[in-house]
Swiss-Prot record:
Family assignment from sequence similarity: Belongs to the methyltransferase superfamily. RsmC family.
Compartment(s) where it occurs, according to its Swiss-Prot or TrEMBL record: Cytoplasm
Key words of the record: Cytoplasm, Methyltransferase, rRNA processing, S-adenosyl-L-methionine, Transferase
Catalytic activity: guanosine(1207) in 16S rRNA + S-adenosyl-L-methionine = N(2)-methylguanosine(1207) in 16S rRNA + S-adenosyl-L-homocysteine + H(+)
Name of the top EC class for this enzyme: transferase
Keyword Protease assigned: no
Recorded GO CC terms: cytoplasm
Protein name: Ribosomal RNA small subunit methyltransferase C
Family matches, as NCBIfam families: PRK09489.1 (NF007023)
SUPFAM superfamilies to which the protein is assigned, alphabetical: S-adenosyl-L-methionine-dependent methyltransferases
Subunit and partners: Monomer.
Amino acid sequence: MSAYIAPSQIAQRQLEYFNGKHVLVAGEVEDMFPLELTAHCESVEVFTSNYSYFRQIRHSDKIKSHFGSEFDVETQADMLLLYWPKAKAEAEYLLAMLMAKLGVNTEIVVVGENRSGVKSIEKMFKEYGPVNKYDSARRCSFYWGNCLNEPKPFNQEEWFKSYTVTLGEQSLTVKSLPGVFSHGEFDLGSRLLLETLPNLSGKVLDFGCGAGVLGAFMAKANPEIAIEMCDINAYAITSSQATLEANGLSGRVFASDIYSDTANDYRFIISNPPFHSGLDTNYNAAETLLGHAPQHLSNHGEMIIVANSFLKYPPIIENAFNNCETLNKTNKFSIYYAKKS
């Protein structure tokens, strides 16, 4: 079995496209195929919004790696290898940003699973130039194209979706970039969690902050707390910072791969964990979040989370804390509470 994800396997069948190129890899890349590319290319750079992947790839001395919501460094790339992202809006955002940066005569290779909507590249790339499918395998497609038209200048500010959410008497302006959980809406799980929260004090972590709805509401309702917000996704980090600024709030927003960059003395950990699909990988991440939480709480620190009720989180929480209460419940969501003894 290949160590590569299916889109990398189809790219691996077409290595001649990359010979002698300066390649920038972006999008939903999550394996070490860029390392193999270094044997065929003049240079390889990786731009990723996934902090976990960045932590893996940054240790390679053969590749320049960049983490962020915007690629704004000097580059000699003359080819973009785009792994098609899950959200179409994120694909549009990446194309607009990277084509503006790389410019006319940049070649593009797009790989992605057919079910992810990679076919959309055919229409989406029209404003830049021609693109055509050259290979299909493993339920994936391989496209090659060329940017012949001058791309429009890119301004990240224009890509934020701005919307207002109201809870009781409190209203909040939320700023959200494409690719962020619940982009443009206030999800029901977060609403239930906020309605259930007690008064907060001390240092509070909003884990998996998304566009910053939870953290901003908590900071607004409890002005004396020291709010910290973390996420694995660079678009979420930038969105949360923008949400805080839009509401005149302050807090520390940073990237973290679960607890890789967090403190260990939080009075509260509050989360709408981004693990709703029930996939094995998500359960592993959730088990780490819940199981290791006591190590990141101060004495008598408390954790309050919202989760889909079908997820078997209470035994994991009970195992970590020796206690677990259900504070609130609907037919879809449950609010779980645990205290470090």
